[in-house]
């Protein structure tokens, strides 16, 4: 297949190139265009403008994978409009191009944050009513809605079953792998310094997405006849912060320092921290200890598999081991 990947030089894009280059012909669309093994050519966004001359010379693509976007800023320092300009605006541009192109498949990388900042119930599923909080999630759901609106016909029914075009909206939870540090690296550095984890009394569960599992799913969507739709993406097993710390210590060859300090006492300290504007406050405690489990049952059923190829703990360990390299 001829595949166009936007944001091809980012973390996910680079891993997709490694996973797909042996069986497919890959092209990029990005703001930078360095030489990359396995990529025939990287185009600029101006090249897909309907008025541009290069657009007339673009290859005939079979599939488009849209990765380009502005990542979630955990420090909240980004201007809100930037999220909409990039996450929503670029999606509109590339999806319009897809509809006019010969490509048959479109994979859009959204996020679970487009649906919910917190999970109500045992797991986050595709039928949840989206209630994103903050410009990152809001810009992602706006992009999703643009795609869905474009797929509506005159009778206001979704044309998701059009055999000529198949559209997939992927909502992965936190993606990790060698080369992508993120929040896992922040926790790793705390553990590496020997700082005890005082919240061991909170046995929270969170879902993660191994980059290897993600590449496996994308390959499946490209090569199998999977129904168009919205699919959540995550590893099979959810892990607690205590389990993450234990895995990190195992990788470092040291004993974990997990303190199970009284839960009520820690909640009281966090409440006091809110009043006194201290680093540990009620909101930060909630973020550190809440459950965020994402169901991957729908995507597994669509691909006809019972399990993801990589266990959550194995994927996390692979990422952790890369931190010391």
Please provide the spans of the model-predicted regions.
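Catalytic helix-loop patch of NAD(P)-dependent Rossmann-fold dehydrogenases
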Residues: 85, 120-175, 196-197
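Conserved Rossmann-fold NAD(P)-dependent oxidoreductase catalytic core, especially the SDR/UDP-sugar
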Residues: 93-135, 155-156
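Conserved C-terminal active-site "lid" loop/helix of NAD(P)H-dependent oxidoreductases
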Residues: 211, 246, 269-306
């Amino acid at each position: 297949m001829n595949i166009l990947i936007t944001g091809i030089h980012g973390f996910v894009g680079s891993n997709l190139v490694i996973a797909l280059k042996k069986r497919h012909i890959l092209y990029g669309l990005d703001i930078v265009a360095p030489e990359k093994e396995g990529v025939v050519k990287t185009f600029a966004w101006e090249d897909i403008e309907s008025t541009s001359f290069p657009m007339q010379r673009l290859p005939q693509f079979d599939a488009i994978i849209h990765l380009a976007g502005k990542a979630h800023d955990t420090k909240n320092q980004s201007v809100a409009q930037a999220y909409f300009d990039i996450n929503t605006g670029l999606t509109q541009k590339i999806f319009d191009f897809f509809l006019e192109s010969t490509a048959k498949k479109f994979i859009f990388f959204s996020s679970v944050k487009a649906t919910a900042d917190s999970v109500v119930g045992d797991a986050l599923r595709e039928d949840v009513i989206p209630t994103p909080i903050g410009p990152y999630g809001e810009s992602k759901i706006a992009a999703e809605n643009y795609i869905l609106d474009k797929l509506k016909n005159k009778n206001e029914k979704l044309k998701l079953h059009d055999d000529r075009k198949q559209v997939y909206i992927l909502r992965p939870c936190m993606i990790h792998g060698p080369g992508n540090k993120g929040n896992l690296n922040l926790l790793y550095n705390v553990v590496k310094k020997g700082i005890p984890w005082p919240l061991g009394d909170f046995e929270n569960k969170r879902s993660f997405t191994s980059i290897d599992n993600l590449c496996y799913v994308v390959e499946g969507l490209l090569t199998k006849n999977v129904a168009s739709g919205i699919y959540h993406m995550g590893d099979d097993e959810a892990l607690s912060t205590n389990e993450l710390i234990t895995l990190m210590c195992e990788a470092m060859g040291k004993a974990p320092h997990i303190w199970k300090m009284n839960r009520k006492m820690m909640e009281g300290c966090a409440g006091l921290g809110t009043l006194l504007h201290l680093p540990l406050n009620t909101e930060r405690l909630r973020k550190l200890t809440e459950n965020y489990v994402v169901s991957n049952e729908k995507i597994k059923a669509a691909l006809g598999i019972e399990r993801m190829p990589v266990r959550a703990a194995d994927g996390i360990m692979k990422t952790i081991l890369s931190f010391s390299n």
